[in-house]
């Protein structure tokens, strides 16, 4: 029987949004490649996911994903604004975009936590300021017919 316990872990460091694929030329032929910053971040995501899975089998059915994206507070913020940011009363309207971080997390977990990110049928995603930057990830396997 499949292990239906949720998997929870944190991807440390400043969150990075998924970069657009770039096109370069190799021996006269166009070649697409993922930007190095994106590839490095997806590697960190995969490593964090592997540690959390601890040898468990990949989820094969539908999953719910919860992402809590914490961005560092800019040094230029006043003490008053920093306190508001940490209290959740000031929201980060700066890069990286929430959806691009979400894409990077999903792609980094392909073949690590689930077979493919098409299995994500429900997501709860938020972006906030935090003392420690990073992304808290929770993946919950769903049973067929479960909402």
Describe every region a protein language model picked out.
Residues 1-147:
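Acidic, proline/glycine-enriched N-terminal capping motif
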């Amino acid at each position: 029987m499949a292990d239906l316990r949720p998997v929870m872990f944190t991807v440390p460091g400043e969150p990075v949004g998924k970069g657009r694929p770039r096109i370069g030329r190799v021996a006269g032929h166009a070649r697409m490649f993922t930007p190095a910053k994106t590839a490095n971040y997806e590697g960190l995501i995969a490593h964090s996911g592997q540690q959390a899975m601890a040898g468990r089998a990949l989820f094969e059915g539908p999953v719910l994903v919860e992402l809590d994206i914490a961005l560092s507070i800019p040094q230029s913020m006043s003490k008053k604004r920093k306190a508001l940011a940490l209290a959740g009363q000031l929201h980060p309207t700066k890069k990286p975009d929430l959806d691009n971080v979400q894409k990077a997390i999903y792609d980094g977990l392909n073949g690590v936590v689930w077979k493919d990110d098409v299995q994500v049928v429900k997501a709860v995603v938020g972006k906030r300021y935090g003392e420690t930057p990073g992304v808290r990830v929770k993946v919950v396997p769903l049973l067929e017919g479960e909402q």
